[in-house]
Amino acid sequence: LFDAASPAQRNTWITDNADRVLIGTSNTANLVAGNFAASLLNVTPAMTLSGALINRMKRSAKALLFPRIRPFKLKENGTEWFVLFCGQEQFRDAQNDNDIKTANQNSRARENQGYLKNPIFVDGDLLYNGVIIREIPELSSRLPVFYKTAGNGATRISPAFLCGQGAAAWCWGKMPTPTFRREDDYQYIRGAGLKMAYGIGKIAKLTNNVNLKEWGVYTAFLAAASDL
């Protein structure tokens, strides 16, 4: 769908969502107002996912006034949690980031087989400053063609999505109901199934009848070099 969008549609999107988008390491320096392609041209190979950029995304998301991006959950001790969805290359960059590495080396529990929950030793999500970093391989395998040479010097770019409450909607058109198949051939063929109608998608909020802002999502466009 993104590949099918026209340059004008992409420009409208970045104009509407300029307050909830990070281009490389800086919006003030890299965002070209009203021009999506020109903005991505400012992303260099060094602008990869890191602990510092995750902190920046989280600060920016929490500072938004409307629509607010709220944490998707609060723990008993009052800590706030967001989820960052990224592709394989960005997850690799996060794993190799010194700040995230140090946090896992020095801040994780060691007793009671704590190593079994440490991503240095086992596969799974990364945790950093109240953000769950989750790898989504399909964000790499289905990366729109446009992104593959969109950055400075044909740098490969991939989006990462910091999500809070209401980042996506699951809408039911018809709730699940059972269905049965019966044949009169001595009851040798019997079956049961479910029928339902639903849809899943991102939510957008129309503000001032002008800007269609994404709800609950802060998007970063970062370098994501392929190593395959």
Protein language model features and the residues they cover:
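Sequence/fold signature of self-assembling virion shell proteins
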Residues: 22-71, 78-83, 89-228
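Short, glycine/acidic-rich hinge or "gate" loops at secondary-structure transitions
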Residues: 1-20
